[in-house]
Structure formats: C-alpha cells, structure tokens
Swiss-Prot record:
Entry protein name: Elongation factor 2
Domain of life of the native organism: Eukaryota
Keyword terms: Cytoplasm, Elongation factor, GTP-binding, Hydrolase, Nucleotide-binding, Protein biosynthesis
Originating species: Meyerozyma guilliermondii (strain ATCC 6260 / CBS 566 / DSM 6381 / JCM 1539 / NBRC 10279 / NRRL Y-324)
UniProt KW Nucleotide-binding keyword: yes
Gene name as annotated: EFT2
PANTHER family assigned: EUKARYOTIC TRANSLATION ELONGATION FACTOR 2 (PTHR42908:SF10), TRANSLATION ELONGATION FACTOR-RELATED (PTHR42908)
Localization in the cell: Cytoplasm
Lineage: Eukaryota, Fungi, Dikarya, Ascomycota, Saccharomycotina
Modified residues (Diphthamide): 699
Pfam families noted in UniProt: EFG_C (PF00679), EFG_III (PF14492), EFG_IV (PF03764), GTP_EFTU (PF00009), GTP_EFTU_D2 (PF03144)
GO molecular function, one term: GTPase activity
Length: 842
C-alpha cells in the first residue's frame, strides 16, 4: 500500500522519462472500469475488498446506476518497480519511481468521441478484451482510433474466470482461445498501424499481453511466471519466457525441450504454457470450487501463499478471490506492462509531433514538442471540458506538450479556427489555477511541466470543446481531433415556461461544451435542436440538460433523423438561370460523385486545404478523374469542406474570376439547404458549363450572382433524379443460438439486412452483423430484448449513407412522405418543387 502525497507526484512530474500517460479502451462491458479498480486500489485510494465492485472511475450518478461508463475520467497513480525490472525498460529512465496518468474511457459506441478525447492526451493504451466474447466491433473502432493517433497498445485478456467457471474449458482449449484473441488483435493492429510506430503488435512471450480477471482482481503475464521459474530452477529468464508460449513442449522424462507435441514413444506431451502457467491456476480453481479442504493447504504452501486466520475460514468463490489475489495480484501484472512496454512522453512525442502539430514540422514549436522540452514556449492541447462541482463552470482538461504551465500565467487561447497572424478565435487571458485530476476529486498544484496531464481553471469561457493554449504568437494550432461517429439523431427542445428561455439557451451552451460530440443549433423555424450520435447518447445529453446545465423542465420532441439530399444521374438537360436584373446567365449541369470520393472527402483524405496539384493527383490516380477537371475544383460545400464540388468547365469566359467568390458563397448556401427539403446535400458535383456576364462591373455584383447560382444549382439537381440518403447503423449482436430467430424477426420488421452470422469458436455464442436504418433504430434494443428474452445485446455504430428507393416527387412514396413531413415542419409548401420553379427559359 503506497500512501503518496501531492508533493511526491509533483516531483515525479519533472522526471518525464518516468511518466506514463495511458488510457484504457475496450468494447462495452469487457471490464475496463473494473480492471482500473485494481490499479486504483494498489495506489491506496479504495480498499481491497471493494476493488472490482467500486468502479471508482464511474463518477457520475447515472454511470453508477446504469453500470456503464459515460465520460472518461483521469487519475494519477504512483508506482515503484524493482531494479531488475527497471533494467529491462528499452527507453531512458530516471530512478525507479513511476507516475502513471490513467484515463478510464467509455466502451459504448455512442460515446466514442469521449474515447478520441482521451486518446489525444495519452501515449499508450491498455486494450481490454473479453476471453469469451473475443474482439468485437467496438474493440476494432477504438484500436483503429488509437493507432491513428500513433498510440502504442498492450493487451489484457479479461474475464478468464468466466472461461474457467462458466464454460469449464480444458487447458489446451483455453490456450487456443487466448492465441485466437491475440491473433485477431494483431490482425487489426497490422491493418491500421502507422509505420512511424514500428512494430506495434502484441506478443505474450515478450510480456505485452496479460491474462486475468478484473472482477476477482488477479492477472498474470508470461514474464511473471518466467521470473518464478528462473528463480526456482536457475534458468535464464529470457529463454524461459520464449518457451512459455507457442509450440514448445517440455518432456519431464528426458528433461528436454522440444517443439513437437509427442515424445519419442509417440506419447502426447503437454504444452509448456499449459503445464507451467495454467496448471497451478486450474488446480487452485478445482480444489477451492470443489471444496477439497485437504488439498488446499498443501497447494497454498507450494505456491507460497499465506492466509490470515480469518481468511482460512472462507470457502468457495470468496476464498478463491482472496487466494488468487495473493497469488497473482492484478495490479502487479498491469503496472509491469505499463511501465516496461508503454512509451514515456519523451519517447512518444518524438514520433507523434508531426501528427499533433498543424504548422511546419521544422519550426521551433514542433521541435519543442518533439523534445518534450519543459523550458520552451508553452504548447498545451485542451481535449475536453470537465464540469466542476460549481454549476456552469468547467475545468479545461488537457496535456502539456511543451513548456510549463503555471497558475497566473498570461496565455493565448486559440480555438480550432485560429490561424497565426489573424485575430479571430483568439483570446488573451491568464490561468487562474492548475489542478491535478484525481478521479472524483482534484488537487491544486502550482505548475505542470511538459509531458503531463493537467486541468486548468479559468479558461472555460473562451473555449467551446477543444483548443490550443500557447504563450507565443507565432505558434500554430495542434491538429483538431477526428471523430469516428457523427451526430445523426436530433430532437427539438422547448421550455414549458416561457420565462425560462434564457436558461435554456445558457444550458445548451454548457451542454455543447461538456460533450465533445453533441451538436446544438437553432433551426430556421426558431426551434432549438440537439443532435447526438445515437439514442443512448441523446438520452444522456438531455437528462444532463434538464438536471444540470439548464435545470428547468423541458418539452422534448420525438427524435428525428438527419437525412442528406443527393442525385442519382446526370442532369437531363443543361440548367440555366438568369440574374434578377436579367443581364447575367449561368449554365450548369449536375452529376453524382462516386461514394468512394465522398468518403475520402469526409475522412479528410481529399482536403480542400491541400495543394490543388496534389489533390488532382489523388483524384486522377485513385478515382480516375480527368486531371484537367480535377485541377479546376472551385470549392467544396457545405461549410467549405463537405462532399460536394463545383468544377469549372467553361472555355474563355470574360470576367470569370470576378464572380468566383459569389459562386462559392452561393454554393455553400445551396448545399447547406437543398432543394428537396432543406437538408444538407451530399455527393453532388456541379459543372459550370458557360457564364454570360454584363460588361459593366456594377451589374454583376454579389447581389446578382449569388441568388442566380443558388437557383441554378437547385434546378440542375431537380433535373438529375433527386433522391434522399438516410443514415444506416451497423449492428453487432452477440447471442446464444436459441435467440437468433428472435433477432431476425425484429430486424425484418425494421428494414434491417443481415450481413453475416458466425459462431465464435470454442463458445456457444453467435455474432450477427446487420445494417439497420437509423430511422428504425428507436426502441430497437428494447424490442430485441423482448424478442430474445433479454439474451441479445446490440451494439449500434454509424456506418454509411444509403439511398432511399422511391421517387421523391411522388407524395405517396416513402421518400415523398419523409420530405413532406419535414417541409411541413419547416413551414414550407408541402410539395417538393419541380425544376421549373428555379429554371429560367432563354
């Protein structure tokens, strides 16, 4: 039990080589918070009896009630290692005390934006996987996010007690299950890994995989067993480690190692991992769970486990817990992995600097980040806001990448749209206090050097969700985080009592601060809209809004899905519009963009800020565009970065460049609110074929060109088989065989399509993957539990946009009904307009 003081932690912060910033990531319900407990308990914050049940990191009331993690929480732990262990660390260290900043993150798909925020400020990740369920959809999503941020993973195979007690597997089966899990994690890692990370795969024989049970509080790595045996038999530990995993067998008769599973007489040999590692565990389990009172003491003596008198009275699971905790304490295995194999900020920032910093990679700030230099100018990234106990105020939670942050220091707060040399999105303020985040509490500290995680007081009014804090005006921003989910479900909120309106507006501001992925805006009809990533996320946001941020009763509409407008063919004829003064004409045609190009734009592979030559190269090589056309992309829309393009295909038009700005502005407007029902437009390319302009500049100003360009964009889209795209979830359901029928019937009712169904080897569970339209997903998990008697648990994650079949202009078709309902809600004419409304005859 290490009782440590804040001063000790503060001293360790200066030895950056001994700091480890890591987050715990996994699929929902694989036991992240439970595992974190054993680490927190080791640091002496909760009692050993509580560990595994306390879920110390679930700080909110609704987290405790639902038993899920919603927000990521941070805590600092202190660990000291033996000198032998420290020698094995492959990087520079200083002494044998270590400071571990640990962030427990949510596993639920709806909150994966919280995970992104946690990953940005850490360098290593503890990936937790359930032995029985194996690698699931969310494991893959978070691992992909982590590797994209250049974060090094180590693996924990959790819930081993389930395999032993529920499934009663044999030793060889268990080894195969472990091997399969490790292999599937490595497949994901090798698919998404960044070459700068080097080999990021995990290997049990190198000590980067731990096996254990968070609930019972025990875990082990192959390295720990190798240590035991090397002391006992006097063999070299490194050799022993290699032999304890994979195809190596020990022949007790000849005392020789072989890699064949039979000896000379053809008798089967036992795998070394089973014999030396699993056997003692299996024996303990068997003796204790079958109440063999006489065998237990001899076993305990052999394994050098000493029980107190009152502990000897226990039996069954209670005894098992105590014994396993003494035999293989989880904290030892996890701390050893974290300290030995995860990088320190000094190591990590050397290869993460260019992915973190937006400016040139050779300027002084990037160099300071690369060297993790505490004496340079301050560079601090705020990744999220944490609400304080005092209503309406937030701690800014982030990491110092260079320099030192002090209380009272004068700083520049740069929002995500800031560019050096301009004044927008920039505040000059001073920091009131710096604090250390400790799970449910905070501790004040005077300053915090580079490489550490910190909370700041007094900057929350000037940042929306994330941003960069510096002390030098030449510094660029740190890169903005990319979220793997997008807000697709929205509701309108209104107050029950008109006097409360200002409170609602204030509450919405606070809500959008406290959650990295919620979107709040005001629609044209004056409604306040809150958009979230899914049903659960929205539910949590609204309960926060009602109880914390606004603190007033609200009326909440039914959830509505955000659609996109698109086209399915080229315009059937050239669309033409004339300006209000009849002196200018624009001729255009619309054509659909391939889904692959749209995805590349949305994922930032094709970027409006790239050099146009580089962009044309990608479009030509990867997507087969004509190079001349690809170079003439005028703009992306909406918001200057959406998946719609204006391409200039005109020949020798006079004054063309003068109207470019007006055309771009009009296109942003037209794609933000499409012609069908005022939703965002997606995958539309507008080709400008010809423009006739008035010779006199005053007759071709913005007031003439902007409305014309917008009308002609609408006309060209309505001439090109307009359609609606709806968002589609990928659903993954794990269930026993007898529940599959129920799943299919629910999916059929809700327009779902099953993509795959497979059995997990070695378990009775099936995994069903299906596509489910977001529109149909409300109440889906409730219906599913009813149909399967509560045995199926769905995971929904936004996957893609799919075109709704049917004619939009026909008011009886499915898209027609949706368009009509939306238009009525917005107070427009209920019919979708024909192209004649925007098309002008010559």
């Amino acid at each position: 039990m290490v009782a440590f003081t804040i001063e000790q932690i503060r001293d360790l912060m200066d030895k950056v080589a001994n700091v480890r910033n890591m987050s715990v990531i996994a699929h929902v319900d694989h036991g992240k918070s439970t595992l974190t407990d054993s680490l927190v308990q080791r640091a002496g914050i909760i009692s050993a009896g509580k560990a595994g049940e306390a879920r110390f990191m679930d700080t909110r009331k609704d987290e405790q009630e639902r038993g899920i993690t919603i927000k990521s929480t941070a805590i600092s732990l202190y660990a000291s290692m033996d000198d032998d262990d420290v020698k094995e660390i492959k990087q520079k260290t200083d002494g044998n005390s270590f400071l571990i900043n640990l962030i427990d993150s949510p596993g639920h798909v709806d909150f994966s934006s919280e995970v992104t925020a946690a990953l940005r400020v850490t360098d290593g990740a503890l990936v937790v996987v359930d032995t029985v369920e194996g690698v699931c959809v969310q494991t893959e999503t978070v691992l992909r996010q982590a590797l994209g941020e250049r974060i090094k993973p180590v693996l924990v195979v959790n819930k081993v007690d389930r395999a032993l007690l529920e499934l009663q597997v044999s030793k060889e089966d268990l080894y195969q299950t472990f091997a399969r899990t490790v292999e599937s994690v490595n497949v994901i890692i090798s698919t998404y890994v960044d070459p700068a990370l080097g080999d990021a795969q995990v290997y049990p024989d190198k000590g980067t995989v731990a096996f254990g049970s968070g609930l019972h509080g025990w875990a082990f790595t192959v390295r720990q067993f190798a240590l035991r045996y090397s002391k006992k038999f006097g063999v070299d530990r490194a050799k022993m480690m290699e032999r304890l995993w994979g195809d190596s067998f020990f022949n007790p008769k000849t005392k020789k190692w072989t890699n064949k599973d039979k000896d000379a007489d053809g008798k089967p040999l036992e795998r070394a991992f089973n014999m030396f590692v699993l056997d003692p565990i299996f024996r303990l389990f068997a003796a204790i769970m079958n109440f063999k009172k006489d065998e237990i003491p001899t076993l305990l003596e052999k394994l050098e486990i000493n029980l107190k008198n009152e502990e000897k009275e226990l039996e069954g699971k209670a005894l098992l817990k105590v014994v396993m905790r003494k035999f293989l304490p989880a904290a030892d295995a996890l701390l050893e992995m974290i300290v030995l194999h995860l990088p320190s900020p000094v190591t990590a920032q050397a290869y993460r600097a260019e992915t973190l910093y937006e400016g040139p990679s050779d300027d002084e700030f990037c160099t300071a980040i690369r060297n993790c230099d505490p004496k340079a100018d301050l560079m601090l990234y705020v990744s999220k806001m944490v609400p304080t106990s005092d209503k309406g105020r937030f701690y800014a939670f982030g990491r110092v990448f260079a320099g030192t942050v002090k209380a009272g220091q004068k700083i520049r707060i740069q929002g995500p749209n800031y560019t050096p040399g301009k004044k927008e999105d920039l505040f000059l303020k001073s920091i009131q206090r710096t604090v250390l985040m400790m799970g449910r509490n905070t501790e004040a500290i005077d300053d915090c050097p580079a490489g550490n995680i910190v909370g700041l007081v007094g900057v929350d009014q000037f940042l929306l969700k994330s941003g960069t804090i510096t002390t030098n005006e030449a510094a660029h921003n740190m890169k903005v985080m990319k979220f793997s989910v997008s807000p697709v479900v929205e509701v309108a909120v209104e107050v029950k009592n008109a006097n409360d309106l200002p409170k609602l507006v204030e509450g919405l501001k606070r809500l959008s601060k406290s959650d990295p992925c919620v979107k709040t805006y005001m629609s044209e009809s004056g409604e306040h809209i809150v958009a979230g990533t899914g049903e659960l996320h929205l539910e949590i946001c609204l309960s926060d809004l009602q109880n914390d941020h606004a603190g007033i009763p609200l009326r909440i509409s039914d959830p509505v899905v955000a659609y996109r407008e698109t086209i399915q063919a080229e315009s059937s004829m050239v669309a033409l519009s004339k300006s209000p003064n009849k002196h200018n004409r624009i001729y255009v045609k619309a054509q659909p963009i391939d889904e692959e190009v749209s995805l590349d734009i949305e994922n930032g592979i094709i970027n409006p800020r790239d050099d146009f030559k580089a962009r044309a190269r990608i479009l030509a090589d990867k997507h087969g565009w004509d190079v001349a056309e690809a170079r003439k992309i005028w703009c992306f829309g909406p918001d200057g970065n959406g998946p719609n393009l204006v391409v200039d295909q005109t020949k020798a038009v006079q004054y063309l460049n003068e109207i470019k700005d007006s055309v771009v502005a009009a296109f942003q407007w037209a794609t933000k609110e499409g012609p069908i029902f005022g939703e965002n437009v997606r995958s539309v390319r507008v080709n400008i074929l010809d423009v006739t302009l008035h010779a006199d500049a005053i007759h071709r100003g913005g007031g003439q060109i902007i409305p014309t360009m917008r009308r002609v964009t609408y006309a060209s889209m309505l001439l090109a088989e307009p359609a609606i795209q709806e968002p589609v979830f990928l659903v993954e359901i794990q269930c026993p065989e007898n529940a599959i029928g129920g799943i299919y019937s629910v999916l059929n009712k809700k327009r779902g399509q099953v993509v795959s169904e497979e059995q997990r080897p070695g378990t009775p569970l099936f995994t069903v993957k299906a596509y489910l339209p977001v529109n149909e997903s409300f109440g889906f998990s409730g219906d599913l539990r009813q149909a399967t008697g509560g045995q199926a648990f769905p995971q929904l994650v936004f996957d893609h946009w799919a075109v709704l079949s049917g004619d939009v202009t026909d008011p009886t078709s499915k898209p027609g009904i949706i368009a009509k309902a939306k238009r009525e809600r917005q107070g427009l004419k209920p019919e979708v307009p024909g192209y004649e409304e925007y098309y002008d005859k010559l």
